[in-house]
């Protein structure tokens, strides 16, 4: 099956929510709606991911210092990764949120500095790529690994099959 990846022009700054899970679902729905409007009749999947550290939402870091701050907060701690997925065919829209709990080993300041000096953390929620160098910090996961990567594949496929 052919597919096209498109960036959404949805303004994420307009969205507020009571919980991180509500936030990612609203963001996924907004992105999906924006792309659906540009591609009538297409089946569109919109996604968004945030990291939740004790109620503080970490999106993508805006600077090196922001990445360092996030990584220090994640060091040795349990956090949750929430990914919202929305699918629409233009007439029907469905969405869900998948949540995964992640625990990192303690991360040394030297490791944080080395990692923040790479390109890897800057386009990832929570400033880390679980499939990259950050895999070295992983103590345990409760939930779907692919939720951490930004698309809970098995749940997404199950929903997509209904369209």
PLM region descriptions:
Residues 7-13:
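Short, acidic/turn-prone active-site loops that include or flank metal/cofactor-
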Residues 1-2, 11, 77, 118:
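A short linear boundary/processing microfeature
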Residues 1-6, 162-163:
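N-terminal G-site helix/loop of the GST-like fold
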Residues 17-163:
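Anionic-ligand binding patches
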């Amino acid at each position: 099956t052919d597919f096209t990846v498109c960036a959404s022009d949805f303004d994420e700054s307009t969205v507020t929510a009571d919980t991180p899970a509500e936030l990612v679902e609203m963001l996924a729905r907004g992105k999906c709606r924006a792309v659906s409007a540009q591609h009538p009749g297409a089946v569109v999947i919109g996604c968004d991911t945030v990291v939740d550290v004790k109620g503080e939402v970490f999106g993508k870091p805006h600077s090196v210092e922001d990445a360092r701050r996030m990584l220090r907060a994640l060091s040795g701690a349990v956090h949750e990764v929430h990914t919202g997925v929305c699918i629409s065919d233009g007439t029907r829209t469905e969405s869900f949120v998948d949540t995964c709990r992640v625990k990192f080993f303690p991360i040394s300041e030297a490791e944080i500095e080395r990692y923040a000096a790479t390109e890897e953390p800057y386009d990832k929620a929570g400033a880390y790529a679980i499939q990259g160098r950050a895999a070295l910090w992983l103590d345990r996961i409760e939930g779907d690994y692919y939720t951490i990567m930004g698309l809970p594949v098995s749940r997404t496929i199950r929903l997509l099959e209904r369209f």
